[in-house]
Amino acid sequence: MPKRNSLLDGTRTSPQWRKARPKLCVLPVGAFEQHSSHLPLATDDIQVDYFGQFVARELGAALLPTLNYGTSLEHTGFRGTISLRPETLMQVIRDIAGEVERQGFRTMILLNGHGGNFSLLPVVRDINRQDRRLKILLVSWYTSVLESGAQGKSDIHAGEVETSVMLALRPDLVRPERPRLKPSVKGFQQPDLTTFGMGFIAPDGVYGDSSLASREKGEKLIRRVKQDLMKHIRERLEWLRRSRIYGRSGRAEK
């Protein structure tokens, strides 16, 4: 296995991967979609790629290239947004899972960076319940942000949290304007995005208040995410060590 201060990724050669023979790999999954007028289209990709590198280094895992497209159908109508259909994303995951399993990997951490990638749930469940040699652990890097309450119910997209994280990671890509949500209707809820799309409720493409963002907040959020993310992953890797059979406890059946 490579040392923690190195990274087994796409910059390495095939013989280097063969020599390392890792059993654990990380696949970051992002999205290529609008983030209003102040954040780049690749925001989700940049963020999940950063955390993917961090996780791979911490665990001595192989890092697969970030999947830069996700399901972003709720952003239909915004120029630059490129979305996969849910069934396409599911098939891509199936194909990648088959390839890494064939090469000897036994666990793949699927690190999600886009809240709209709901189709990852059923495909991961379907693969895991087959009790194949490969197990997939699905994790979203922003889960701890949601659980901590740092991201309010009105801060869903391109708002305070995402802008703060980008100010910490890539301030050179954050434009000076700070748009905020100007809802076109009252009583709109996040599930309504599946019916009306982002452009209906938020023509400017922001669901939140980016004016509240700061680099300091972003750095604080990143530190918290790193800590919570590794605790979450290590705990579940231990669960997998105890039992890799889907739906069965770690205790032997009598």
Per-region residue spans from a language model:
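Extended, histidine- and acidic-residue-enriched regions that form the cofactor-binding/catalytic faces
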Residues: 1-107, 113-254
